Structures are given as structure tokens and as C-alpha cells.
């Protein structure tokens, strides 16, 4: 096992930068200072479908719909809607809304955003079904025409945020900024939304300052005038900043520090189950792995190798040692809260001896070498989980070179814009629609850019079974809940039989919050501070 040593220098630089920034942040009942382990990569709301990034963007941009504190879909820039028939939706847009630069919000912005979000470079193409045709009825009415019924259409739109057409055109930002971009676009460094806050300044890797939007169309639920966001990669520095009062909110709190924060008398940890599933994936599409000692073929195309990896991973040990009990081992690629038949599935037992035998049968009695991609500032104890997996695979003869990177570099490498450059990886997924269809379509769907560029968009390893695609299409249009759940079950059963992925667990939420602050914690782990209040 080897973790790239360059990470140390990057981490030190991040810590030093964070300390300098914090010292300059004002302490006030109207200023909330928030720190996260990861940075805000881009202000372009279509660059990265990642919970922390979406939460940041949702302070300044808005969608036609949004989710309330209980995760229910509610109106936002669309004040109402109705279905004229099962394939014809009509949306009535909110009048009198202004973008932060004063431009009026109209149907033209929705039409533009519907095209931009589906354009090359967007990480949100699957949020809008490819058969959806947008028609402008008038300046404040939009029709959406579908080829077939879609009862979860507006749930799929969660995370799709509306942009100002005029502003994008004027600033050469008609095309979305891909996650793999090495040169920032205007939209990646500036924002112009309709949301409750606007961004006064943005220094990537250092600090982003949000200011309250006095012209927001809705009724504010916060007493905040400013939010100062600072990325602090170091867990120890992040916790120290909370306990010293330098910041008011941190996410996540390291599991080992939860008791200390709760005992501090100045802060507490908000915990709860998260809807995110953490899992391992393998490159199943290439004929030869990009990063492996095996040449001329791909070991993962043999189901015995995939089964061996699955049975070599001890999720109970990860739960006990790495997650300190704050995780729930999973047999599925979806949280049990989102699928009622989850309890009908069980994980294959941890069995390293059987795993070793399977590798031998597959022609790898001495194992092989490969590289594992892992973020080190995205999920709870993500790098530690990967290190544990490396040790477990070593027991069956597989030598893993662990490449643990900050999420900016990680996602730029492994996502679609970067060419899915990974052989073995750790990822987390919360279905934006809070529905199993999202998992089957985005994570387990066959990639086919020519036929449907949205299917399998987040399927980094290229797993493909056409029977799952057929079932997924039936799931989308089925309105009978019992029949729909059975279709979902059939699809998951196929994926499990083929060892398409290795689900690990649902992680627990852990937000560190000053006793001066009250906020709402949702199970999707979006830190939405426009509901927060602070008292000195």
C-alpha cells in the first residue's frame, strides 16, 4: 500500500490558509462562519452533482421546485403546476423575481437552463429526461411534453437550478463548465442567481463570502446577514476552530471527536441517519484496466474476481473500527429509508478464504496489482475506509496502490468529463429524487452517449445489463407502488447476482454546531444555512 506523499504538502497548505482566513473573519450574531472538509470547486451550478456543492449553490441559485425541511417537494421559481394529461405538464412561473444583477426572471431563462443542463460538460444531464420537450407558452408559463408518463418528474428536478440566459450569453458562459476543466469559466468564478444570498467574494481554496439578498422574493427565515465559508481539510484544525469559537458550524465532525465536542459546553454534534450509500466500484467496461499489473485483459470482467473482492471486504470491521459504530452496513445501493423492500436483501458473508479460492479459480492465484481512487475530503472517514479496504484485499493477494486525493482532483479524474479514468474506486451516492429509479438509471444503467447520454452518467465503472435498463424504464412509468417495488427488486437482484458493485454502508450525519446557532439537519446532508439563526 502507498498513499501519495504529495497529499501531505497539500494538506499543510490548506491548514495554513484556513487559519489565516479564520483570523480575519468577524464574530457577529449576523455573521455565521461555516467550515467543511472540502472546497467549493465551481460556482457553475451544472459542474458537479455533489451534495456539499449543491447545498452551496442552493443559497444563491434556485430551481423551479425545491425541498422543504422534511424533504418534501415544494414550489420555488415555479409557483404551481398541473398535469394536463399524463405526458403533458404545465408550470406557472413566479412573477416579479429578479436575478442578483437585476435581470427579470422569465420563461426564457427556464428554456435556456433546460438546454444548458443537458449540454456536454454538465454533470446534471440525468436530472432532465431526454424525452422532455420544453415549450414556452408565455413569459411565465412553460409546458413540458413527454413521450411517456413520468410520475417522478419534479422529484428528478431536485438540484437543477435556473440560470440567467442574458448573463450567461454576455459572459461567454452558455456552455456548462465540466468538472475536468483546467481553466475556469466566468460562471465558475461568479454567480447570478435568484436565491436568498448572493456571493460577495469567492477565493477558491480560501474563502467564500455570502451576503443576504435584500430583494429575495420569499419570506426569510434567518437573521443572518452574512455567511463566511472556509474549507478546512484537517479534521483536527476544523474541530479546534469550532471549539475555540472561530467558526460556528463544521461538517463533518470526525467520529472520534463527537464525544469531545458534546462535552465542550460550547458546541454540540447533530447526528442522524444519512440517505447516502458508500460503495466500491470496479471498471467493468475496458478490455484492459488503466492501472493494473494485468495486461491484455480486465480481471473484473470475470464475475469470480468481483465476488472475491466483495467477500474480502469486512464491512462489520469497517463499521466497528473505522466508523466507530456510526454506520449501517448495506446490502443494496440505496438507503433502506428510500426502498421498502430493503429488508429482503442480505449481504454475502465476509469470507477471505472463499475469496482467495475464487481468485485462484479465475487464474490469479497470486493476486494482482491495481490502483484505487479515493477522495480524502468528501465522505466521513473516506480515506480511512479505503486504507482498510487496501489491507483487507492484501490478505487475498491483491496489492492496491491507494491514490487518495481532495475531491476536486478526484472528481475531475473519475467522472464523465474526465473520461472515467479509474480502475477501482470509492464513491457515495444519494439519489437526488429520493427514489430507487435514480440509482438504477444513474449508477447501474448502461452508458450509451449516442442513444441516451443521461443513462449511466454516474456509472463510473461502466457496468451494463440490458435487463436492468428494461426494468428501469418500466419503473419510471409504473404508478402502482406494489408493482413498482417488485420491478425495482428484480433489477437489484440482477445487480447483486453479478456483483456489479460492493455496497458498504450508509454513513451517519455529524455536524458540529455552536450553541449560539440553531439550524435544520436533513437526511440528505445538505447544510442549508438559510434556515439558520444565530444569537450571541
Residue ranges and their predicted role:
Residues 1-14:
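Bacterial N-terminal signal peptides that target proteins for export
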Residues 18, 22-24:
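N-terminal signal peptide c-region/cleavage motif recognized by signal peptidases
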Residues 35-85, 115, 192-194:
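N-terminal lobe/hinge region of extracytoplasmic solute-binding protein
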Residues 66-69, 82, 86, 94-125, ...:
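Extracytoplasmic/periplasmic ligand-capture domains
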Residues 82, 126-176:
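Surface-exposed binding/hinge segments that line
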Residues 324-345, 510-514:
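Mature extracytoplasmic/periplasmic domains
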Residues 511-536:
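Long beta-strand-rich cores associated with HINT superfamily self-processing modules
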Amino acid at each position: 500500500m502507498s498513499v501519495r506523499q504529495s497529499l501531505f504538502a497539500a494538506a499543510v497548505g490548506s491548514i495554513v490558509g484556513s487559519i489565516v482566513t479564520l483570523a480575519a473573519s468577524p464574530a457577529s450574531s449576523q455573521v455565521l462562519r461555516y467550515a467543511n472538509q472540502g472546497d467549493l470547486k465551481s460556482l457553475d451550478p451544472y459542474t458537479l452533482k455533489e451534495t456539499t456543492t449543491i447545498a452551496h449553490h442552493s443559497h444563491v441559485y434556485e430551481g423551479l421546485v425545491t425541498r422543504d425541511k422534511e424533504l418534501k417537494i415544494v414550489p420555488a421559481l415555479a409557483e404551481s403546476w398541473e398535469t394536463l394529461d399524463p405526458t403533458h405538464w404545465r408550470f406557472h412561473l413566479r412573477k416579479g423575481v429578479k436575478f442578483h444583477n437585476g435581470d427579470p426572471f422569465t420563461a426564457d431563462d427556464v428554456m435556456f437552463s433546460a438546454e444548458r443542463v443537458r449540454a456536454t460538460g454538465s454533470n446534471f444531464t440525468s436530472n432532465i429526461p431526454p424525452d422532455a420537450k420544453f415549450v414556452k407558452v408565455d413569459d411565465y408559463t412553460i409546458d413540458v411534453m413527454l413521450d411517456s408518463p413520468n410520475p417522478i418528474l419534479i422529484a428528478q428536478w431536485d438540484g437543477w437550478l435556473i440560470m440567467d440566459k442574458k448573463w450567461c450569453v454576455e459572459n461567454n458562459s452558455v456552455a456548462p463548465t465540466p468538472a475536468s476543466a483546467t481553466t475556469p469559466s466566468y460562471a465558475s468564478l461568479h454567480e447570478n442567481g435568484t436565491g436568498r444570498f448572493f456571493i460577495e467574494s469567492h477565493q477558491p481554496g480560501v474563502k467564500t463570502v455570502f451576503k443576504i439578498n435584500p430583494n429575495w422574493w420569499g419570506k426569510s427565515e434567518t437573521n443572518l446577514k452574512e455567511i463566511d465559508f472556509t474549507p478546512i481539510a484537517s479534521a483536527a484544525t476544523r474541530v479546534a476552530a469550532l471549539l475555540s469559537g472561530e467558526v460556528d458550524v463544521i461538517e463533518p465532525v470526525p467520529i472520534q471527536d463527537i464525544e469531545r465536542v458534546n462535552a465542550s459546553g460550547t458546541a454540540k454534534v447533530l447526528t442522524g441517519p444519512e440517505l447516502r450509500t458508500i460503495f466500491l466500484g470496479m471498471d467493468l467496461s475496458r478490455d484492459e484496466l488503466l492501472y493494473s499489473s494485468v495486461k491484455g485483459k480486465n480481471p473484473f470482467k470475470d464475475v469470480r474476481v468481483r465476488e472475491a473482492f466483495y467477500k474480502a471486504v469486512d464491512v462489520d470491521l469497517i463499521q466497528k473500527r473505522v466508523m466507530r459504530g456510526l454506520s449501517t452496513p448495506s446490502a443494496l445501493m440505496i438507503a433502506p429509508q428510500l426502498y421498502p423492500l430493503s429488508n429482503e436483501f442480505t449481504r454475502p458473508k465476509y469470507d477471505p478464504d472463499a475469496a482467495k479460492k475464487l481468485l485462484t479459480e479465475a487464474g490469479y492465484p497470486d493476486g494482482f496489482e491495481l490502483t484505487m481512487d479515493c477522495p480524502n475530503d468528501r465522505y466521513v472517514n473516506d480515506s480511512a475506509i479505503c486504507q482498510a479496504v487496501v489491507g483487507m484485499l492484501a490478505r487475498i493477494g491483491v496489492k492496491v496502490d491507494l491514490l487518495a486525493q481532495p475531491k476536486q482532483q478526484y472528481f475531475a479524474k473519475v467522472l464523465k468529463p474526465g473520461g472515467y479514468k479509474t480502475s477501482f474506486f470509492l464513491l457515495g451516492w444519494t439519489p437526488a429524487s429520493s427514489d430507487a429509479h435514480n440509482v438504477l438509471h444513474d449508477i447501474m444503467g448502461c452508458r450509451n452517449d449516442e442513444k441516451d447520454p443521461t443513462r449511466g452518467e454516474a456509472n463510473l465503472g461502466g457496468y451494463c445489463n440490458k435487463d436492468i435498463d428494461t426494468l428501469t424504464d418500466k419503473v419510471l412509468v409504473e404508478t402502482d407502488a406494489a408493482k413498482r417495488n417488485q420491478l425495482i427488486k428484480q433489477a437489484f437482484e440482477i445487480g447483486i447476482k453479478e456483483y456489479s458493485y460492493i455496497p458498504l454502508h450508509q454513513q451517519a450525519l455529524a455536524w458540529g454546531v455552536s450553541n449560539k446557532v440553531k439550524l435544520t439537519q436533513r437526511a440528505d446532508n445538505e447544510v442549508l444555512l438559510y434556515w439558520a439563526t444565530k444569537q450571541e
